[in-house]
Structures are given as structure tokens and as C-alpha cells.
């Protein structure tokens, strides 16, 4: 679960000890954390570098937590990174452009945005790709069913921007997606946790009028048999061209 503690190693070790005993009593032989109860793409891990205002779904923990975990004996299991790039032509990787152009010379491949799709097409394509793209044996990652996809898109609806969702197809079959949203912490911090009355008005104002300048890469997937061919590059390039050439709202892209 999550971890909160004052700046006192003894207090931290008391919490760790209690967790360890609880797990041992239930037959567990290892302990990991801090983790969110759910998929590992949301609020997992301990922040060890880059103590700046966090982006949506990124954990924020105090710097003094790091030695608590290390001194108790925790070691890295896997590392997660957040990257930021400026959305200008100069920042576009030549490799991304080359891969995209090479792939799209084959007319069997097609990249389209959410604007060109119906919600039903997007949901069905997402479900197909997700369950082909992710290694279901990877720790913390599971498959999705139709009901979960419906819930996901219903949750995204208030913040969905059609310019931030891209899908790849091969001979009409869905093979990849790149799902982004506006960086939500920019909006949420003005609402102060109160999504009602004035809070709703503030949410709508900062979502649609005084909009943020950062797009957040939420989830990326390419069907396993099409990985390594440049499909991901083609989706990234399509998004960047759309934003840069049409001078859309966003100046930055954050990805994890």
C-alpha cells in the first residue's frame, strides 16, 4: 500500500516491521512497495529523483523516504521514468520521422486520430490491441475485458481530447494505440478536491478555457507481432505533426 511517515527512521522501521509481520503471518516470503492497489501504471513506486510538482498518476513522496527504504533493506525491483519533450519540430527525433515514413510507404498501414472514429470503434480497437500488446505474464499487468474498457472510456470522457488519441491499423485490423490526456494535476490543483458546485465550474474553466500546456502519455500499446516495425514512431509522428503544424494548445509531452 501507500507509505506516509514523519522524518524519523525509527518510526518508519516500526511501520515496515508491522507490515512484514502481517505478511509473514499470511505465508508471504517477500515484501514490496510502496504500491497502489491496482495496475502498476498508476501511483506505483518511490520517487527518488525529480522532486518537482508531479504529473497525473505519478506518486509524490518525500526525499527523506529514500534512505528509510534503503536502510531497511529494500532494493530496486524495477525502475520507472517520466520523460518530457518540447513539442517543436526541432525536438522531433530524426529516427522517429524516418521510421514513420518508412512504415507508411506500405499503404496497408494507417494511423488515425480519435476525431476520425466513432466511440465504439475506439473502444473495440483499444480492447483488441491492449490484450495483444501487453505481456500478461509481466508483474502488475493483466488483461482487460469489455466492461473494464467501458469504465475506462467513461472515466476519460470529461478530459478526453480527440487530438490526443491515435490508433494504428494494418489491413483494417487494429494493431496499436497511443492514448494521451491533458495533464490533469494542472486542473485538479485549482479544484482542491471538490468536484461539485464551484469546483465543477473551476474544472470546466481550466479544462476548456485556460487550458494547460502539457499533454500526458497515459498508455501506449502495439500488438506483439507488430512491435519493432515503427508503428509506435508513426503514431508519435502523427500526433506531433498535428499539434505542431496546426499550433494546437500543447507545448510539452510527458511520457512514462
Where are these regions (language model features)?
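Acyltransferase donor/substrate-recognition loop-hinge adjacent to the catalytic core
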Residues: 59-140
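Acyl-donor binding region in acyl/amide transferases
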Residues: 1-73, 191-256
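Short beta-strand segments
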Residues: 32, 84, 167-169, 179, ...
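Short catalytic/ligand-binding loop motif for oxyanion handling, primarily in non-cytosolic enzymes
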Residues: 39-43, 77, 91-93, 176, ...
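Short loop segments at secondary-structure junctions
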Residues: 86-90, 171-172, 225
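Conserved beta-hairpin
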Residues: 17, 21, 25, 70-72, ...
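A conserved beta-strand-loop-helix scaffold within acyl/acetyltransferase catalytic domains
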Residues: 4-5, 112-222
Amino acid at each position: 500500500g501507500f507509505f506516509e511517515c514523519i522524518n524519523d527512521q525509527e518510526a518508519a522501521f516500526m511501520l515496515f516491521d508491522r507490515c512484514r509481520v502481517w505478511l509473514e503471518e499470511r505465508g508471504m516470503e517477500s515484501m514490496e512497495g510502496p504500491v497502489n492497489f491496482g495496475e502498476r501504471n498508476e501511483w506505483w513506486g518511490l520517487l527518488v529523483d525529480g522532486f518537482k510538482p508531479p504529473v497525473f498518476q505519478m506518486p509524490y513522496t518525500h526525499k527523506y523516504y529514500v534512505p528509510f527504504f534503503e536502510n531497511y533493506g529494500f532494493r530496486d525491483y524495477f525502475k520507472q521514468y517520466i520523460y518530457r519533450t518540447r513539442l517543436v519540430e526541432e525536438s522531433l527525433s530524426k529516427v522517429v520521422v524516418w521510421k514513420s515514413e518508412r512504415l507508411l510507404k506500405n499503404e496497408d498501414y494507417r494511423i488515425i486520430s480519435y476525431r476520425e472514429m466513432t466511440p465504439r470503434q475506439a473502444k473495440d480497437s483499444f480492447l483488441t490491441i491492449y490484450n495483444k500488446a501487453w505481456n500478461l505474464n509481466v508483474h502488475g499487468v493483466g488483461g482487460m475485458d469489455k466492461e473494464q474498457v467501458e469504465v475506462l472510456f467513461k472515466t476519460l470522457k470529461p478530459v478526453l481530447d480527440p487530438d490526443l488519441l491515435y490508433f494504428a491499423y494494418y489491413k483494417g485490423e487494429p494493431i496499436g494505440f497511443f492514448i494521451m490526456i491533458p495533464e490533469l494535476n494542472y486542473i485538479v490543483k485549482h479544484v482542491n478536491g471538490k468536484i461539485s458546485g464551484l469546483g465543477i465550474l473551476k474544472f470546466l474553466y481550466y479544462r476548456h478555457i485556460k487550458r494547460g500546456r502539457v499533454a500526458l502519455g497515459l498508455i501506449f500499446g502495439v500488438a506483439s507481432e507488430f512491435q519493432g516495425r515503427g508503428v509506435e514512431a508513426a503514431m508519435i509522428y502523427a500526433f506531433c505533426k498535428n499539434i505542431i503544424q496546426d499550433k494546437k494548445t500543447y507545448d510539452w509531452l510527458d511520457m512514462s
